[in-house]
A protein has these predicted regions:
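ATP-dependent small-molecule kinase phosphotransfer cores
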Residues: 44-131, 138
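Post-Walker A helix-loop "phosphate-sensing" segment adjacent to the P-loop in P-loop NTPases
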Residues: 28-39
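A glycine- and Lys/Arg-enriched "phosphate-lid" helix/loop adjacent to the NTP-binding pocket
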Residues: 115, 120-184
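P-loop (Walker A) phosphate-binding loop of NTP-binding proteins
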Residues: 14
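NTP-dependent small-molecule kinase module
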Residues: 165-244
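Hydrophobic positions on the alpha1 helix immediately C-terminal to the Walker A/P-loop
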Residues: 22
Length: 244
């Protein structure tokens, strides 16, 4: 697989949508093709003041810490807690995250990799906001002007009931609302929607989307830098030298 520049790819979706599985398959496919990949987890590698935010959230909202599983469900209280002052505070934090994201991408792009892959992106934070509010949509559009747009931004759609069973952390009603927010955001930022599919089919869908994007990139490059024409020929077919 050939590539002409660094590609930025992100995976987003509700908790339990199967992002980790698809990211592992995607990165494995790229590495098997001889490409160099940098993988970043948004919360661990990008988010500003991550420890402070987690500690403050646990102390203020009294939710559980960790990752939920079918045999060990938990009750998280963080992004599902909403109020006007929390929205204002989150908007400020997301601005800091945007600056951090630009710095992380810039450093990675200079490291010689072919692909930069994100397990969640700033899109996942923006989906926590009330996108039905006109002022918030204006804020989102403004913020999006300053962050790198992924070449491929995958949104893994999932049935809320099935996702909640796989990863029981939030109330089902919130998961439904969160899914709707993602779908609304996907129309705002032109994400590639991966429909709810069996794992193997979703993996194939992602690979096909990648192949189409690479083909389009190569076509765009050829249109921008067309191959030089061969030597001019005379009427009898002999080559004619050309001079400038």
């Amino acid at each position: 697989m050939g590539i002409n520049s660094v590609k930025l790819v992100s995976f987003s979706g509700i908790d339990g949508a199967g992002k980790s599985t698809q990211i592992e398959a995607f990165c494995g496919h790229l590495r098997a093709s001889g490409l160099r990949v940098s993988l970043f987890t948004f919360w661990d590698d990008v988010v500003a003041l991550a420890r402070f935010r987690e500690h403050a959230s646990l102390k203020a909202f009294k939710g559980d810490k960790g990752v939920g599983s079918p045999d060990k469900p938990i009750v998280r209280r963080d992004k599902n807690v909403r109020s006007w002052y929390l929205t204002a505070f989150r908007s400020l934090l997301y601005l800091l995250d945007a600056f951090s994201l630009c710095r992380v991408i810039s450093r990675s792009a200079d490291s010689g990799v072919d692909f930069i892959v994100f397990d969640r992106y700033i899109y996942d934070e923006l989906a926590n906001l009330n996108l039905q509010n006109r002022l918030i949509r204006f804020y989102v559009r403004l913020l999006l002007m300053f962050i790198p747009k992924p070449d491929l931004a995958f949104l893994l759609d999932a049935d809320p009931e099935a996702a909640t069973l796989r990863k029981p952390e939030y109330p089902l009603e919130f998961v439904r609302q969160n899914r709707e927010a993602y779908l609304r955001l996907s129309r705002l930022v032109s994400m590639t929607l991966v429909p709810p599919l069996p794992v193997a089919d979703a993996t194939e869908f992602v690979r096909n989307a990648l192949a189409q994007d690479l083909m389009k990139a190569q076509l765009d490059l050829r249109l921008q830098y067309p191959w030089p024409a061969g030597p001019a020929q005379s009427a009898d077919g002999e080559n004619v030298s050309t001079r400038c």
